[in-house]
Amino acid sequence: VAYEVTGAPDGFPVFLLHGTPGSRSGPKPRGIVLYRMGVRLIAYDRPGYGDSDRREDRHVADAARDVEAIADHLGVEQFAVVGRSGGGPHALACAADARLRGRVTRVAVLVSLAPWNAIELDWVGGMNTGNVRGFGVGSPDTAAVVEEIRQRAERAAADPRLLLADLRTEMSAADRRAVNDPALRRLITDTYAEALRSGPYGWIDDVLAFRRPWAFDLSAIDTAATPVRLWHGADDNFAPVSHGRWLAAQIPGAEMEVRPGAAHFDAVEELPRILRWLVDPDAALGADLLIGARPGQ
């Protein structure tokens, strides 16, 4: 598993779990910003993405073992976890994991999907047609779903700007405003390029993992020991806000924050504030917390 560490070397460790498709190089606060916040940010490529070896038939719950292995390798005893978009379910896996109990201090989840088999949730309600097709909703033909992702991944690997252009055709007005920022566009296309340069398998295996049971119980999350905060943009049509509300209802004691007029990519802007909550819930958000450049720039 490939990982990178940015920010303050002696800061509080926070694992950042990327979206789908994504990589460890995805959008994050600048290195100097993380340093000032006292955050040691650890990001890694899920198996099959970037420089990480593929692990076929993985489940969402397997992310807890990846995080545990990296934490052990780095000598990190306690840490927080934040997952954005497709990283959200994987972050919740860490919160629920028995072996990580006492090690995971807080968990934040931004614009996450709910489980495929969520009871009393219209899983596709409010979701754009591209995502409905990409997840193979209504299709029992796994091979056809894999082929759809493979074709999209090959096209994106050849030119990552094409994937973002495809997404823009179905974005809400809020998301179009967000990706009008050239710096954010560059970060998004760069992470797509890194994610897919070794093949489509990370993306394929993410989707297959989302289509099967997550292999952990949301109700097992003890928010008294590991506080959980969920954030969602009200206008998200990639992972509709109903998914976030459903998750919050399944996790006793979880906090849910919905931002009116915001959508999926606004989660990037929210990340510094969420990181502040993860490392120091009583601290005020500094005015100098900026997004938009690679770590260290």
Where are these regions (language model features)?
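Conserved hydrolase catalytic core segment
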Residues: 78-123
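Alpha/beta-hydrolase
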Residues: 129-217
